[in-house]
Amino acid sequence: MSSNVVETIQPVAAAIVSAHQFELVDLEFVREGQSWYLRLYIDKPGGINIEECAMVSDELSEKLDAMEPDPIPQAYFLEVSSPGAERPLKKEADFQNAIGKYVHVGLYQKLDGKKIFEGDLTAVTPTTLTIDYLDKTRHKTVTINREQISQARLAVKF
């Protein structure tokens, strides 16, 4: 059900966001406990502010309320926010822009005994990512097939 909601709402949300020259980073419809959440993550060069998030929220809420049939028949919370410092990497442009940055990559199955890699993204191809990471005190490099990746995002290095 949540994928159908996202497929229905994505073009509406994308039109509103792009009309303001913002980027729709991600859109998700998820259940947490007893509540449903429609979450949009938007951004622009230099960062997005709270007023811009509120403006997109108001416009999207108005459009969704006017849609027939209702794309989300149950009660839900609409949240519009910045992707934050740990921005998800989903589109090809996201990966290209992340080259040289510190990333967190989770895998479906272990590779070299690990399911999570955090390190500097050094190369991106249409099928792979290459990450330089620290294993205890040794620098290592791993190349990961994209099909193995469950999720990827920028990460904050401590």
Swiss-Prot record:
Main localization of the protein described in the UniProt heading: cytoplasm
GO process annotations (BP): ribosomal small subunit assembly; translation
Signal peptide: none
Subcellular location: Cytoplasm
GO cellular component, one term: cytosol
Key words of the record: Cytoplasm, Ribosome biogenesis
Pfam families assigned: DUF150_C, RimP_N
Function recorded in the entry: Required for maturation of 30S ribosomal subunits.
Similarity-based family: Belongs to the RimP family.
Name this protein carries in UniProt: Ribosome maturation factor RimP
Species name: Lactiplantibacillus plantarum (strain ATCC BAA-793 / NCIMB 8826 / WCFS1) (Lactobacillus plantarum)
Gene name as annotated: rimP
